[in-house]
């Protein structure tokens, strides 16, 4: 049986994205980060809404239209409407951060 916490490489030069399921407009991804962040001045501007939860580790998101960043720890989730510009400011370097992202 597949497991979200299996097959996580010890070293990750960049984020690891794995599509777990895709049907019509819905896509479910596992994202693994380990001390990663978005490049300077880069903003995600996605055509699809995204719902994301942190399953392991911790992260900080920044939304272009918000004055303060959003810190996420295990169990925290956020809905990101389509075209709401955001970036990953930080993921913990202490352990892999495992996200589950659902694009709607």
Q: Model-predicted segments: where are they?
A:
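A short beta-strand-loop-beta hairpin characteristic of the jelly-roll/cupin
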Residues: 39, 44-46, 51-74
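A short, N-terminal "cap"/entry segment at the start of jelly-roll beta-barrel domains
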Residues: 1-43
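Ligand-binding loop in jelly-roll beta-barrel domains
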Residues: 73, 82-104
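Short strand-connecting beta-turns/loops that link adjacent beta-strands
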Residues: 25, 66, 93-95
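Residue-level recognition of conserved beta-strand positions in structured domain cores
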Residues: 30, 56, 63-65, 82, ...
């Amino acid at each position: 049986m597949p497991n979200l916490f299996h097959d996580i490489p010890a070293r990750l030069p960049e984020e690891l994205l794995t599509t777990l399921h895709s049907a019509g407009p819905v896509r479910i991804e596992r994202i693994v980060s380990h001390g990663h962040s978005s490049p300077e001045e880069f903003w995600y501007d996605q055509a699809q809404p995204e719902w994301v939860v942190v399953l392991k580790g911790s992260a900080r998101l920044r939304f272009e239209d918000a004055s303060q960043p959003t810190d996420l720890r295990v169990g925290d989730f956020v809905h990101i409407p389509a075209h709401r510009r955001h970036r990953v400011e930080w993921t913990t370097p202490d352990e892999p951060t495992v996200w589950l992202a659902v694009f709607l």
